[in-house]
Amino acid sequence: MGKVIGIDLGTTNSCVAVMDGKNSKVIENAEGMRTTPSIVAFSDDGERLVGQPAKRQAVTNPERTFFAVKRLVGRRYDDPMVEKDKKLVPYKIVKASNGDAWVEADGQTYSPSQVSAFILQKMKETAEAHLGQKVDQAVITVPAYFNDAQRQATKDAGKIAGLEVLRIINEPTAAALAYGLDKTKAGTIAVYDLGGGTFDVSILEIGDGVFEVKSTNGDTFLGGEDFDMRLVSYLADEFQKEQGINLRNDKLALQRLKEAAEKAKIELSSTTQTEINLPFITADQSGPKHLTMKLTRAKFEALVDDLVQKTIEPCRKALKDAGLTAGEIGEVVLVGGMTRMPKVQEVVKQLFGKEPHKGVNPDEVVAIGAAIQAGVLQGDVKDVLLLDVTPLSLGIETLGGVFTRIIERNTTIPTKKSQVFSTAEDNQNAVTIRVFQGEREMAADNKILGQFDLMGIPPAPRGMPQIEVTFDIDANGIVNVSAKDKATGKEQQIRIQASGGLSDSDIDKMVKDAEANAAEDKKRREAVDAKNHADALVHSTEKALAEHGSKVAEPERRAIEDALSDLRESLKSDDAEVIKAKTNTLAQASMKLGEAMYTQQAESDAAKHAAKDDIVDADFTEVDDDKNNKKSA
């Protein structure tokens, strides 16, 4: 069995780790970074860029650069959160044929699962380069408050990327694993996870290798991206007041503002003031305009205060669900890049009455925990038991549109629960089971996960048939539902697939696309490498020809020039094989030139040596220092 990797698929950054002996190790990517920006872009010529290369060109290519796509995973196009996102991002969010929110570049649409798969592929390649072996299994983390559709979409992303997802694990739980693996003392901890796009809080009991989640709560649309956008809005407003130009209408300017906002936010975690300086941000009839502004930490904290305060209520709910007070929490572990913000740390301290624990790297701890869980599944990590919970209640719609819970939120998973229902009308021969997830009392106010029909119920007065509905949640938090007529034994079951979501054929097509793209990417890479090698040879040959061309016979010189010309021509194409062949031809032809250079060098060295041999050593006499304090030659 090959290595199973742990991946933190983040909104802003992603990270991959693997068990190395008894320890979990974060793997550096090709750029030498321990985290990879969760950004995918398409260049003018259709080349796909992932991570740092995509981030570097975002300012000049905003409409084809996808960031924070995790916030769209498993969401419908008409979701209020998607409406909010559409106004803030420079790329197009479009309605897919199944009603989901997808993204578009150059007329080509991509599902959020597909974009996530491009990032997962990068993580997979990073691990393979480090391990020197193929990797096809992973544990992937998701926000604890992700619903079933979002978890399923994440699993789909893994499949598209060529990974078998052995387990979907909640981010705070993964962080707790990393924090508590070497702790011998039992205790209760809170994991406060404020990342790039989501907020989660989980309460766990840790002891004797058992990690038991008591409760979880959160907000899947609250994170660093919102802090950035709040600052972008402020900068745009201030610039409009000063210059009368609305930068929101200029996608390129907006992307520059976003980059500057993120940089300023990070700087203000370690300094009390920063300067935002964006020359030539736009122009009007009077000429170019520059944006220069000083921003204090106090001003930034005032701008985002309500966002920080929004994290308090989920913490209180999680404590209440766990049956605990803040004083009973032994340690608060901070996870996610946003927890570096002093204001966030201050709010956590006020809420829990203690200094938060800062001994873990907030950007890496989730991936480390995922790798530990991978180690548990592989049998490399012993005596660790992880008991997670379902974040939201699950149930069905019953008479009058009421939401009847079958599995309450914060129930330990995996779990299976049944409840008996009946018909609402006389002689009813079929029932439709509509499955929902959420905490509202009316079904319509919750998230519909799917529906199915149980047919062939024998005629009977209403209330007589016994229909047993069973919910089964696996360790990934993914739901299966069945309905059985107890009188006839007839049963209908479905693995919940959101009313949107990707069908098996969609996933298969995307897997094939990914494989085809992998081959295309390899071909493109080979062409680039061949061109680089050819360019270097052309340059060195031209230089050598200019300096030493007179030392080779005319036919040989002509052969070199012809080979040079052919190679230059081949560089106009992307055919790696042709370029390699022409490179070899030039290398062979220019061997005579190399021989001439070496011959000349050898002759030059011999002449220098001979000249050295002709030097006559001078005689000298040593004079007694006492008499004459010097030497004469």
From Swiss-Prot:
Induction: By stress conditions e.g. heat shock. CDD domains: ASKHA_NBD_HSP70_HSPA9. It comes from the Bacteria. Gene3D superfamilies: 1.20.1270.10, 3.30.420.40, Actin, Chain A, domain 4, Substrate Binding Domain Of DNAk, Chain A, domain 1. The modification Phosphothreonine is found at T198. InterPro entries: ATPase_NBD (IPR043129), Chaperone_DnaK (IPR012725), Heat_shock_70_CS (IPR018181), HSP70_C_sf (IPR029048), HSP70_peptide-bd_sf (IPR029047), Hsp_70_fam (IPR013126). Keywords: ATP-binding, Chaperone, Nucleotide-binding, Phosphoprotein, Stress response. One of its GO terms (molecular function) is ATP-dependent protein folding chaperone. HAMAP family: DnaK. Acts as a chaperone. NCBIfam families: PRK00290.1, PRK05183.1, prok_dnaK. Belongs to the heat shock protein 70 family. This is Chaperone protein DnaK. The lineage of its organism: Bacteria, Pseudomonadati, Pseudomonadota, Alphaproteobacteria, Hyphomicrobiales. The gene is dnaK.
